[in-house]
Regions:
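Domain-level signal for soluble alpha/beta catalytic cores
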Residues: 1-225
Length: 226
């Protein structure tokens, strides 16, 4: 671990999806193409994106998060014990509603055999003497916030009556993914965390979490586990 950024300039790692990829994902959702057909389009568009990153002189390369429908939820869905469901209402951004997916707990959370490890291996294949493959991931706090988003918290508490056990399993799941990524050759992991912005507005946080997790509790969790 280093406290200094390895490069003078850098990127977040998420890029706008090309129309060809968006069309392929929509066709897959409608059952018009198979998963392998979608993967082929993803592979081809990621390869094009990486060439653009290299041409721009970037020293880290990512897949642009092209294999995801959301920047964070797809990673959560890759954990064992977590399932994808659709809500009646999606996220709200300045009056605009996004898609309605979320993540709920259905069993003991585990990071074993996470699909993002295979995703990383594809990007790793494009590394050269000037570039390093990066894996972007949503932070553990983002997962905790999602599991207590709206009525999700009732489901979470039913599976995990003891909050400490939930926190320990989330931490263990992330450590498993980190180990597997390391063994796959990953030396650059970026954690993205939007919960910091949620904390700026107490009213928003309380409305979103419906009192399930208070800001005081989050602070206590941070002190205990960081």
């Amino acid at each position: 671990m280093t406290l200094r950024a390895p490069f003078r300039f850098d990127i977040v790692g998420s890029f706008l999806r090309p129309d060809r990829l968006k069309e392929a994902r929509a066709r897959f959702a409608r059952g018009e193409i198979a998963a392998l057909d979608l993967k082929q389009v993803e592979d081809e568009e990621i390869a094009k994106l990486i060439e653009k990153q290299k041409a721009a002189g970037l020293h880290t390369i990512t897949d642009g998060e092209f294999r995801r429908s959301y920047w964070h939820l797809d990673f959560f869905w890759g954990f064992q014990g977590i399932t994808h469901i659709e809500l009646e209402q999606g996220y709200q951004f300045h009056g605009e509603e996004t898609a309605r997916g979320t993540a709920i707990v259905t069993g003991k959370i585990s990071g074993k055999d996470h699909p993002f490890v295979e995703h990383f291996k594809y990007v790793k294949g494009f590394e050269d003497e000037n570039t390093l493959a990066r894996q972007t991931l949503p932070a553990p706090a983002q997962l905790l916030a999602e599991l207590y988003r709206g009525d999700n918290g009732k489901i979470t508490d039913a599976v995990y009556p003891e909050r400490e056990e939930l926190l320990q399993d989330i931490a263990a799941a992330y450590r498993q993914v980190f180990r597997d990524l390391y063994e796959a050759g990953c030396r650059n992991i970026q954690l993205d965390d939007c919960t910091w912005g949620m904390f700026c507005d107490t009213e928003y946080w309380n409305k979103r979490q419906k009192g399930a997790v208070s800001l005081k509790q989050v602070a206590e969790i941070g002190r205990a586990h960081v």
